[in-house]
């Protein structure tokens, strides 16, 4: 296929246009007075949201050159979301600021490679300063504050703090849609492990790319399943019962996987295959934990058991199983309470007797999964549109809270970035790398400036006031006053800020060093009308 190529400044200008379209759409949502964006859906009601990554994912531009710029910024939001689960709008604002300032410098004749190096070194310095400002989260009140800031709702913040208290920081919290108007918290016994579906063709919800099985049978084996004859009796038995099936195995290979997918697509079987978690002895222990929780047997080669001889009585069950591309969550296993209690005691004994720190951590992780249970936040609302928006906010707040527990908290509302800027005043590099440092320094003011502008104020004036204030004093956009941010409960997870800085700098550096863009030449649409002979 023929290609269209643009070079130099023309190429970078097109990228910048795409960056601006996406960033300008996303950044209106930043801060407590940020606005919402309405997204048309091909079916159902429109989606109203202020979640940066959700908005970014919907944007595709008609001009293929500009679309590349938009897709690069979309990558910033997606990566920030993958790492920290929040801070996608901040990352987008930082990236746009770095790209705009950087392109000005390159148009004026600066060397893009040296500018890129300067950006990378300055970002590394900024992240190291951020780490010194991080403060470990202390108690439920700070957990509630982090969640409240992220969700923009104190009630949601308190609900998440309560959920964390119930299951502990190693427990699992999920968000579901309720059938009532109320948003409630429910704690269910359950277990999650870090393995997702073997094939995406096995999902039950293509929009969210998840598989949900209600009241499934559960087959657990430490073998590779490579021969269809091995599991045919189990498949036939579950098909007759009209219940779904979860298969946990070392692997499901070749023709077996193909057969499962084909039967799933035809509607003959509702089956999901996942790989067994961990390796070696840790895997054996984890599979036994799952078996006890679900009242099943581990079909093991070490025990001389054969899959062909397995019947329904060897399978376990649970109220619900949720599988994503990365995780499997088993809720409401039918295992006997005394067996689970006995297993927990056994693991506790192993923890106290082992001298290996690695093994101790591994056993503690298994203990948390077996005893922690699952907290389910059921989101209620009057309309479907509001329900979707509220669910997204709760998911963001949950991610922000987990990030805060991992790496601590810092002053929120863009304040910590201004504090980093103050400490970076003396940080200089030689030659054109200095330009990269200045680009990062200027970008650090962008989130606070945008928060103030979204509140209807002059952003640059607010930035100067915070710059000249004492350490820790920032701008509370909700009340439009200058306060001690941490004391006022306006805090951000350090991980979210770090991820936003690193991802925005990475993509900005890519845009600035781009010298050519190549896209496919669109095909000319041929007219369906046949050529008519000329009339004489």
UniProtKB/Swiss-Prot annotation:
A GO cellular component entry from the record: cytoplasm
Record localization: Cytoplasm
GO molecular function terms attached to this record: ATP binding; ATP-dependent protein folding chaperone; isomerase activity; unfolded protein binding
Pfam family name, one: Cpn60_TCP1
Main location: cytoplasm
Gene3D superfamilies on file: GroEL, GroEL-like equatorial domain, TCP-1-like chaperonin intermediate domain
EC number, as in UniProt: 5.6.1.7
GO BP terms in the entry: protein refolding
Binding site for ATP: 29-32, 86-90, 413, 476-478, 492
Enzyme class label: isomerase
Catalytic activity, as annotated: ATP + H2O + a folded polypeptide = ADP + phosphate + an unfolded polypeptide
SUPFAM superfamilies: GroEL apical domain-like, GroEL equatorial domain-like
Keyword Nucleotide-binding assigned: yes
The entry's keywords: ATP-binding, Chaperone, Cytoplasm, Isomerase, Nucleotide-binding
UniProt KW ATP-binding keyword: yes
Family assignment from sequence similarity: Belongs to the chaperonin (HSP60) family.
Protein purpose: Together with its co-chaperonin GroES, plays an essential role in assisting protein folding. The GroEL-GroES system forms a nano-cage that allows encapsulation of the non-native substrate proteins and provides a physical environment optimized to promote and accelerate protein folding.
Subunit structure and binding partners: Forms a cylinder of 14 subunits composed of two heptameric rings stacked back-to-back. Interacts with the co-chaperonin GroES.
PANTHER family: 60 KDA HEAT SHOCK PROTEIN, MITOCHONDRIAL
Protein name per Swiss-Prot or TrEMBL: Chaperonin GroEL
Native species: Methanococcus vannielii (strain ATCC 35089 / DSM 1224 / JCM 13029 / OCM 148 / SB)
């Amino acid at each position: 296929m023929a290609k269209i190529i643009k070079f130099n400044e023309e190429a970078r200008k097109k990228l910048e246009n795409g960056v601006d379209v996406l960033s300008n759409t996303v950044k209106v949502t930043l801060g407590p007075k940020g606005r919402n964006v309405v997204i048309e859906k091909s079916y159902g009601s429109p989606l109203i949201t202020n979640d940066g990554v959700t908005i970014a994912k919907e944007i595709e531009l008609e001009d293929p050159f500009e679309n590349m710029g938009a897709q690069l910024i979309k990558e910033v939001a997606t990566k920030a979301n993958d790492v920290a689960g929040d801070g996608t709008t901040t990352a987008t604002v930082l990236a746009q600021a770095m790209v705009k300032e950087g392109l000005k410098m390159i148009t004026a004749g600066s060397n893009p490679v040296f500018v890129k190096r300067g950006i990378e070194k300055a970002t590394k310095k900024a992240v190291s300063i951020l780490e010194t400002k991080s403060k470990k989260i202390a108690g439920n009140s700070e957990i509630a504050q982090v969640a409240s800031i992220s969700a923009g709702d104190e009630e949601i913040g308190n609900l998440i703090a309560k959920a964390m208290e119930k299951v502990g920081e190693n427990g699992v919290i999920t968000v579901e849609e309720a059938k009532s108007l109320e948003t409630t918290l429910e704690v269910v016994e359950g277990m999650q492990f870090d393995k997702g579906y073997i094939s995406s063709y096995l999902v039950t919800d293509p929009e969210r790319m998840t598989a949900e099985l209600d009241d499934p049978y559960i087959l657990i084996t430490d073998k590779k399943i490579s021969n269809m004859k091995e599991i045919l009796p189990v498949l036939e038995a579950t098909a007759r019962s009209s219940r779904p099936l979860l298969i946990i195995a070392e692997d499901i290979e070749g023709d077996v996987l193909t057969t499962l997918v084909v039967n799933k697509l035809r509607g003959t079987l509702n089956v999901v295959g996942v790989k067994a978690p961990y390796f070696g002895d840790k895997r054996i222990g984890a599979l036994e934990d799952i078996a006890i929780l679900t009242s099943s047997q581990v079909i093991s080669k070490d025990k001389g058991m054969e899959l062909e001889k397995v019947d329904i009585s060897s399978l376990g069950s649970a109220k619900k199983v949720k599988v994503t591309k990365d995780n499997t969550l088993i809720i409401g296993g039918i295992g006997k309470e005394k067996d689970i209690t006995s297993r927990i005691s056994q693991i506790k004994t192993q923890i106290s007797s082992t001298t290996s720190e690695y093994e101790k951590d591994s056993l503690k992780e298994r203990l948390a999964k077996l005893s922690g249970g699952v907290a389910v936040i059921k989101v209620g609302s009057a309309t479907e549109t509001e329900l979707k928006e509220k669910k997204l906010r709760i998911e963001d707040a949950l991610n922000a809270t987990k990030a805060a527990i991992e790496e601590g908290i810092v002053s929120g509302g863009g304040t910590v970035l201004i504090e980093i800027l103050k400490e970076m005043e003396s940080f200089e590099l030689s030659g054109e790398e200095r330009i990269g440092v200045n680009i990062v320094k200027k970008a650090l003011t962008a989130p606070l400036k945008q928060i103030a502008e979204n509140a209807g104020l002059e952003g640059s004036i607010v930035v100067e006031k915070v710059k000249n204030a004492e350490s820790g004093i920032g701008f509370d956009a909700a009340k439009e006053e200058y306060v001690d941010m941490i004391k006022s409960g306006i805090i951000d997870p350090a991980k979210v800020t770090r991820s936003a800085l690193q991802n925005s700098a990475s993509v900005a550096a890519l845009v600035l060093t781009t010298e050519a863009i190549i896209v496919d030449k669109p095909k000319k649409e041929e007219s369906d009308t046949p050529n008519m002979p000329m009339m004489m």
